[in-house]
Amino acid sequence: RNIRVNAIAPGMIESDMTAVLSDKVKDAMLAQIPMKEFGQAEQVADLTVFLAGQDYLTGQVVAIDGGLSM
């Protein structure tokens, strides 16, 4: 059938939505993320391209969250 289905589970991605958060809220969120930074849209886009190009990878949910879900 050659149907591939994968999903991306993003964590906090720097965006207009995170830009309006107070420093206190941002600091509290970043304290929980092992990489200590918000992700970037380009990083999610790179993962999307990778998943779309893999012929033998299917049925996966890939977290891109700076290690938060570990």
Where are these regions (language model features)?
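Short, cationic motifs built from Arg/Lys/His that form the positively charged side of catalytic pockets
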Residues: R4-N6, E37
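C-terminal substrate-recognition "lid" of short-chain dehydrogenase/reductases
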Residues: E37-I64, S69
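Catalytic Tyr-x(3-8)-Lys segment
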Residues: K24-Q43
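Short, small/polar-rich loop/turn modules that mediate ligand/substrate recognition or access, typified
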Residues: N2-R4, T58-G59
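N-terminal/domain-start segments enriched in small and hydrophobic, helix-friendly residues
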Residues: V5, D16, K26
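Short, flexible catalytic-loop segment of classical short-chain dehydrogenase/reductase
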Residues: A9-A19
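Hydrophobic/aromatic beta-strand patches that form the interior of the parallel beta-sheet core
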Residues: N6-I8, V62
